[in-house]
Curated annotation (Swiss-Prot):
Protein name stated in the entry: Regucalcin
Source organism per UniProt: Xenopus tropicalis (Western clawed frog)
Enzyme class: hydrolase
Catalytic activity as recorded in UniProt: D-glucono-1,5-lactone + H2O = D-gluconate + H(+)
Lineage: Eukaryota, Metazoa, Chordata, Craniata, Vertebrata
Keywords (A to Z) from UniProt: Ascorbate biosynthesis, Calcium, Cytoplasm, Hydrolase, Metal-binding
Subcellular location: Cytoplasm
Function: Gluconolactonase with low activity towards other sugar lactones, including gulonolactone and galactonolactone. Catalyzes a key step in ascorbic acid (vitamin C) biosynthesis. Can also hydrolyze diisopropyl phosphorofluoridate and phenylacetate (in vitro). Calcium-binding protein. Modulates Ca(2+) signaling, and Ca(2+)-dependent cellular processes and enzyme activities.
Amino acid sequence: MSSIKIECVVSETYKIGESPVWEEKDGTLLFVDITGQKVCRWDPGTKKVQSVSLEAPVGSVVLRKSGGYVMAMGNTFSALNWQDQSVTTLTCVDEDKPNNRFNDGKVDPEGRFLAGTMSQEIRPAVVERNQGSLFTLYPDHSVVKHFDMVDISNGLDWSLDHKTLYYIDSLSFKVDALDYDMKTGKSSNRRTLYKLQQDEGIPDGMCIDAEGKLWVACYNGGRVIRIDPETGKQIQTVKLPVDKTTSCCFGGPDYSEMYVTSACEGMDEEWKKRQPQSGGIYKITGLGVKGIAPTAFAG
């Protein structure tokens, strides 16, 4: 494990860096700053970040097959045209809950965009409980709700055989598994896969590797952990130099690099002095495992 290398590749400090997605065609990393209300794109070649400022918190962003991106922003699924920075609302959710916003999301292997909601944070990781839901945006822009009574809807991904959806509601301190019907996009039979240890922090964003193991970024835990879904056991921990690790994805030319986003919101001056690169983006190499290319939204 001594070959693992961790470097801060984007030192700009984002309030809540999240939703990293590798965009293969340009070799760039897409991500959001949730409360900074931005979608950003980092080019490893130029080491520059371009960003688009938005009018609401943006929980997640995904690639779109027809070009541009789709965001889970505020209480909307919205399209973003990167060239002219225009935003088009596709549909709204949770209209009876004005204090709710979207959080993490990801596209399933068939091109549907799943994203969940939560109430706006009172302070980091403190929310009005049970206000969120998990939704699917279908390619025809219709929306289906999977379930409600969620605290902080967070990381999700699918098993390599596409039969299982892995899902995190952060304040349950668990990673759950659900049966997933890839034909219809419906989920059922939710159960606990892994319960986090106290020192591991709060489960946040998540991705799967090419060996079918899950990687979970642990907020306030300063680490990503690797979980074997077959055994429900944690099999690896990689610690980072910042506590507020938020999400992770694989990227790079062969998907052998892991990118980890982080946050600085809610940190006092003394904490920031100790961890000045909180809110930056980290690259981990030498993990010895590759990731899976993200799917683009089909609609």
